[in-house]
């Protein structure tokens, strides 16, 4: 059934959507109202970066900051914005693969709209100091986004502890269904819509909901978080053995 429809099968479908949303939100310590489902992590990244850029451009803030080794969903979104007249600063990592908060702060300008730094690098595995970078961004009134696709379900992720404004994730990274992602937006943070149409996702992302995908994503993340300590201990054992 269609979860937006007012008949019995539609109500049943909506229950699956609501349950999946609650499961994903709980896993990252967010409110269900702060979670918006997407088709993948790349869509969530595009929405966070481009939606923020379009929103902040109305305040004459057209500068963005990211790292030089982000996922292509971020890098290509930034490149697209540059072609539209936005300016982007790319922070180079240290030799060990980390982004230093002081380098981010040095790059912030009065017209900076967004800082977007990947939480866990998908190629070299470094985990960035997102909490400290978010504190720097907020000190200057700048929104903070992190691509946590590689982190959610693999390491503890608590959006309140991190202090981020937006966070992207993808279901397939924690054994959920492909074609499902989500964007966390802290209460009061609204990047401009990229997909307009119906009133789904609190009018922020149109399109009939992928009920099975949402249910699968919620259950998969619930299971991943439940067994997280056990899995991390096993992976540490394997790493140390190698």
Locations of the language-model features?
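Pyridoxal 5′-phosphate
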Residues: 1-242
């Amino acid at each position: 059934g269609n979860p937006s429809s007012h008949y019995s099968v539609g109500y049943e479908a909506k229950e699956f959507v609501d349950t999946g949303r609650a499961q994903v939100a709980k896993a990252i310590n967010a409110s269900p109202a702060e979670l918006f489902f997407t088709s993948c992590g790349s869509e969530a990244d595009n929405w966070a970066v481009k939606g923020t850029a379009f929103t902040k451009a109305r305040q004459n803030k057209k500068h963005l900051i990211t790292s030089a080794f982000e996922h292509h969903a971020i890098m290509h979104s930034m490149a697209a914005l540059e072609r539209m007249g936005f300016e982007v600063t790319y922070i180079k990592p240290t030799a060990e693969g980390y982004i230093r908060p002081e380098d981010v702060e040095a790059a912030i300008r009065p017209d900076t709209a967004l800082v977007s730094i990947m939480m866990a690098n998908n190629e070299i595995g470094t985990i960035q100091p997102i909490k400290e970078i978010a504190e720097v961004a907020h000190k200057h009134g700048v929104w903070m986004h992190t691509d946590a696709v590689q982190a959610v379900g693999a390491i503890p992720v608590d959006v309140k502890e991190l202090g981020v404004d937006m966070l992207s994730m993808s279901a397939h990274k924690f054994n959920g269904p492909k074609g499902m992602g989500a964007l966390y937006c802290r209460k009061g943070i609204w990047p401009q819509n990229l997909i307009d149409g119906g009133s789904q996702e609190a009018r922020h992302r149109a399109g009939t909901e992928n009920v099975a995908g949402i249910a699968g994503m919620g259950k998969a993340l619930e299971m991943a978080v439940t067994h997280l300590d056990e899995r991390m201990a096993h992976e540490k054992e394997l790493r140390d053995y190698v």
